[in-house]
Amino acid sequence: MAAEIHSRPQSSRPVLLSKVEGHQDVVSAALLIPKEDGVITASEDRTIRVWLKRDSGQYWPSIYHTMSSPCSAMAYHHDSRRIFVGQDNGAIMEFHISEDFNKMNFVKTYPAHQNRVSAITFCLTSEWVISTGHDKCISWMCTRSGSMLGRHYFTSWASCLQYDYETQHAFVGDYSGQITLLKLEQNTYSVITTLKGHEGSITSLWWDPVQRLLFSGASDHSIIMWDIGGRKGRTLLLQGHHDKVQAICYIQLTRQLVSCSADGGIAVWNMDISREEAPQWLESDSCQKCEQPFFWNIKQMWDTKTLGLRQHHCRKCGQAVCGKCSTKRSSYPIMGFEFQVRVCDSCFESIKDEDRTSLATFHEGKHNISHMSMDFSRGLMVTCGSDRIVKIWDMTPVVGCSLATGFSSR
């Protein structure tokens, strides 16, 4: 069912502790059970499984429950041992897990959506289960009565969700590339603002209530940090992945962001430094360096008897430049560019060697990651992917945590 990986920890990369195998289809979500050597998984094969580590070092399912529809999302509240499972048919089912994690009792079904559930969160204080779905809406339902409290529709599929429990604000990412901030009330709501910055669909969100930072990952391979608490519209761009960003997790203790992409890439970003905002791209009818006209500037082309050029942009200064004035490429990590991007020749000369020092570390998960979650107290991460395999990692070598891991890599 599951293998224990016998490898010696390396100081510079995540340590693979265990593989959990046995699902017959894509694993949609996997969550580590706090203070236990256990993992809860939800899969497209219509099963919910609770895996506990045995004396042999292998993981075996102590709970194996078959649902009526493929499982698409999951939320687990450890203190109350309540689990909420979103399904492809739009329903959310609540279960209660026994103290020994060997039994799971059905509680109730919530008719939350008309289509696939994409994300779920549970708020104990208000007794709300909040969810998003491919029916283009966010809904919040009362877990006491099972009744619908509110619903808001977007223009495209709602793909991911984060919730601020203290202020009752919800952040919803959608397939159009927008993030909507809503204030949820008992029977009403208000749309606060919409955040736009990605060029692809939003695939993952993470909200840090301490620093009031929102992180978003998207299919455009990039991550944006939105400084909500600063109230100045400050954003930071992080580009280091070569495929769509599938999951992100911010470690408040060490000020590090962990991100995973569909190609198996795992990145750890240092956010405990003063990063620079990437500039807005400037628009011009001619190169802002040599003043040669761009190809749509017919008048200047006619007046100067020259051919029009293609417009490019310097990633460091944002100026509109032609190809001849931007022949160089450079990384510029302080602005979030971890690999080489186009810069104008004058900006290239201003970048020193020390400016190219990476501010992130990159690692290989060796499977197509579709979901990731972490247990901060133990420095553990669990990833799952389209290969039906769940992997448990010790992240302490790369996230700077000195906390002892509960998963042995003997």
What is the role of each PLM region?
Residues 313-334:
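Cys/His-coordinated zinc-finger cores
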Residues 1-2, 9-22, 32, 39, ...:
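An edge-strand/N-cap motif at the start of beta-rich repeat modules
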Residues 248, 260, 382-410:
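C-terminal interaction modules of eukaryotic adaptor/scaffold proteins
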Residues 24-32, 68-76, 115-122, 156-163, ...:
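Canonical WD40 repeat/beta-propeller blade segments in eukaryotic WD-repeat proteins
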Residues 42-45, 86-89, 132-135, 166, ...:
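Conserved strand-to-loop turn within each blade of WD40 beta-propeller repeats
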